[in-house]
Amino acid sequence: MKKEEIIQAIKEMTVLELNELVEACEEEFGVSAAAPVAVAGAGAAAAGAAEEKTEFDVVLADAGSEKIKVIKAVREVTGLGLKEAKALVDGAPKTLKEAASKEDGEAIKAKLEEVGAKVELK
């Protein structure tokens, strides 16, 4: 039987027949059709720490002495209204943006630090 004939036979099978075929192949060859699942261990934790994060939370740690400039910058980067931006700055430390890309996070951090705020990327 050629590969094309096998593929054609599989195309003509019902879902139930395909399920039975998979189970028969698992039994015959001693394999599993389940997707491999990584088990986290001590080595995996160390390897995970070496991987670079792709999403960051931008946290306003402290507004500094130039609070008005910081409020303006917060409004600019978040799109919030004056009242909301002021409340956010007054309530520091507060998260400005969640799951930001590294470049977005760095840009927001630079803009706020430029006006005297202390910002952290977590």
UniProtKB/Swiss-Prot annotation:
Domain of life assignment: Bacteria
An example Gene Ontology molecular-function term: structural constituent of ribosome
Cellular component aspect of the GO annotation: cytosolic large ribosomal subunit
Alphabetized UniProt keyword annotations: Ribonucleoprotein, Ribosomal protein
One GO-annotated biological process of the protein: translation
Complexes and interactors: Homodimer. Part of the ribosomal stalk of the 50S ribosomal subunit. Forms a multimeric L10(L12)X complex, where L10 forms an elongated spine to which 2 to 4 L12 dimers bind in a sequential fashion. Binds GTP-bound translation factors.
Family assignment from sequence similarity: Belongs to the bacterial ribosomal protein bL12 family.
Classification via PANTHER family: 39S RIBOSOMAL PROTEIN L12 (PTHR45987), LARGE RIBOSOMAL SUBUNIT PROTEIN BL12M (PTHR45987:SF4)
Role noted for this protein: Forms part of the ribosomal stalk which helps the ribosome interact with GTP-bound translation factors. Is thus essential for accurate translation.
Name of the molecule in the record: Large ribosomal subunit protein bL12
Species of the source: Clostridium botulinum (strain Loch Maree / Type A3)
Gene that encodes it: rplL
